[in-house]
Amino acid sequence: MAGFQMNLKKDKINKPNSQSKPKISFAFGGSKTNIIPKKSIASSQKNETRKLNPNALLGSESESEGEDAVVAIDSFDKKKGGAIAGNKAVNTKVTEPLIIKPTTASRDWKEEIRKKQNSMYIPNQEHRQKVIAKDDNNLEFGLSVPEKSNSKESVVDAESNDTMSKEERIRSSLLKGEELDDKGLIIPIPSEDEIVEQDISSKPDEDSIEQYKEVPVDQFGAALLRGMGWKQNKGKNIESAGKPLLERRKKGVLLGIGAKAVEDELMADLLVKRGAKFDIPVVRRNKDLNATK
């Protein structure tokens, strides 16, 4: 900065008879203390870059994140992670793409309960069915033979069951196709209120306002598409998993959305090509009888 400077100087040798008069000198210009040579600035910047913590290039320095660090970037390579300082990448943190999975539509839980209840097996359900009584007074024609009682066989089975072990009884009952004894197990069927409570408890918590603010607005659409199965580096015309490619429907002339293509002859008549004529049959009609001939 420009300024004004005044210095007062005295003689070093004091003569006895002469009066000492101070010498006054004036100087115009900037102060010498504020002037810094250019070489010192360049050397100080080099020293700062040399004294830089090597861990700062990897983003793992112990200092606070708010302080700025001087990093000399030599090149830029997208495959290696962006900016490169020397042989190392400046930012080695790999950020995964944001994915937002859409929630399912509101389900009709009452209908689901009815389907589950109808599909459940209810024991001894055959006993609840209506029994059609047989009429014993019906007359039967032909020779009637009375059925023999199996009392002897039942006595033999009871005696054999007493001598058999539990494993043998179970094995014989399975071979004969008999049903095992009911142990009285009860499977509780949840009510509608309990199912609603289970459905509410299984759903995730609502997102807070802070979580909404963390999602960038410009990345919301791509994140929602990724949640629905979209892949960024995959084009439309690339065939995958043996699925056929989508073909565009050829839309004919004078056709709207959802209309089908017409035949070639009718299309030629609509376009009024050369030699195309509309044939209208002439019918003779009797006015009195209002009948055709």
Curated annotation (Swiss-Prot):
Signal peptide: none annotated. InterPro entries: Spp2-like, Spp2/MOS2_G-patch. The keyword Nucleus applies. Residues 1-65, 142-168 are annotated as: Disordered. It is found in: Nucleus. The keyword Nucleus applies. Keywords: mRNA processing, mRNA splicing, Nucleus, Spliceosome. It comes from the Eukaryota. GO terms for cellular component: spliceosomal complex. GO terms for biological process: mRNA splicing, via spliceosome. Involved in spliceosome maturation and the first step of pre-mRNA splicing. Associated with the spliceosome. Belongs to the SPP2 family. This is Pre-mRNA-splicing factor SPP2.
